[in-house]
Amino acid sequence: MGRIKVCNFGRIMLKIFCWTTVILSIYLILGFTGCYEKWFGGPAGIVKAPVYWLIRAGIGIIVESIIFWIGIIMVYATSEQLGIRWRVLGIVCGWIPVAHLVMLHIIIKTVGEEVRMEKMRAKRNLQRKAQRICSTKYPVLMVHGVFFRDFEHLNYWGRIPAELEANGAVIYYGNHNSAAAVRDSAKELAERIHQIIRETGCEKVNVIAHSKGGLDMRAALALTDIAPYVASLTTINTPHRGCQFADYLLGKIPGKQQQMVANTYNAGAAKLGDINPDFLAAVYDLKSEKCSEFNNEIKDNPDIYYQSVGSKLNHPASGRFPLNFTYPLVKYFDGPNDGLVGEESFRWGQNYQFLTVSGKRGISHGDMIDLNRENIKGFDVREFYVQVVAGLKKMGF
């Protein structure tokens, strides 16, 4: 909560700045016009006593500047919800009369909502701390999707793992390549699960897999020997039936251009730690035809609990880049979608949850892993995962 305390102090300083600026302005206007002399026999106006009022105006401006800069630096340095957009607009509009007041109001309001949310969350976690509602029988393995890696200082899952751990969960990560064929990723994940079993002595793991990671894990359970070591698989926005828009793009883009993109990606991924990354193999395994073949071959294990989650955006403009651009294309081919995957592709297993919120916002593919660390009205992504894991605990997993 240290960050939130600093953020809240900055917000308070900005509110103080607003009120004291109004008071100072009224004080100086009345003083400049000689009202104090007329009403109380006080100091004369600025025409008769310019030095007197210029000194006071200068002191007031200096004090107000100090209050403002302390506040704005604190909220800019600590707020997660301001994001790049509001920070940049705040800087730009700071030089524009009237617009700077509107932006200051937005900044104070946004930070205030963030502070209230985090305080509420901290209070709730404190109240249920003894219950350890996410302390499952088996640890949780979180499996990333395509084109991402598990970095130590840039968590793929945003603020979610910390929230789960605060409620008693033990978390591990897949640590597999960012781009590979489903079957190759399956082998990597099988090796990772064996490693966790060896090093910790746990009997099994509960897997939560996002996007292509869900296909990777289904393949691992069916094609490798790790099924006895997995209690449950929860897939998040996984394209179980593929992506028809991917079929279209791959059919339209010439092979030469595809290979150029693949070579560029593979070279970059290798520098970041991937071993033999394969961009095209990963992408082609997401085609609807490939997923249909995959589903005919890969069968669920009756001894493992499978469940799935999906979500959708309500409007293209509500998604963050690049999902705001891909949404219309995906909608044309796949219908309602999360910016990448169509609604019809999400459902898998014994239990299925489909998530959205009212209004234009919706919940994107990236929102489901807290990619932008954004608090969405009507959907608390961190608490959602807490309840998912708490549900696994209640089921004995």
Positions of the model-derived regions?
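Serine-dependent carboxylesterase/thioesterase catalytic core
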Residues: 144, 171, 187-294, 338
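Active-site catalytic motif of lipid deacylating hydrolases and related acyltransferases
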Residues: 132-204
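Extracellular/periplasmic catalytic domains that process cell-envelope and extracellular macromolecules
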Residues: 134-135, 225-228, 298-302
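Flexible, membrane-associating and regulatory peripheral segments of lipid-active enzymes
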Residues: 1-153, 397
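Short aromatic-enriched loop/helix-cap "lid" or pocket-rim segments at secondary-structure transitions
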Residues: 154-155, 243-249, 317-322
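Glycine-rich, phosphate-binding/catalytic loops in enzymes
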Residues: 157-160, 223-226, 250-253, 325, ...
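Hydrophobic/aromatic beta-strand patches that form the interior of the parallel beta-sheet core
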Residues: 141, 172, 232-234, 307-309, ...
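C-terminal catalytic-base region of ester-bond hydrolases, centering on the histidine
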Residues: 51-62, 89-92, 300-397
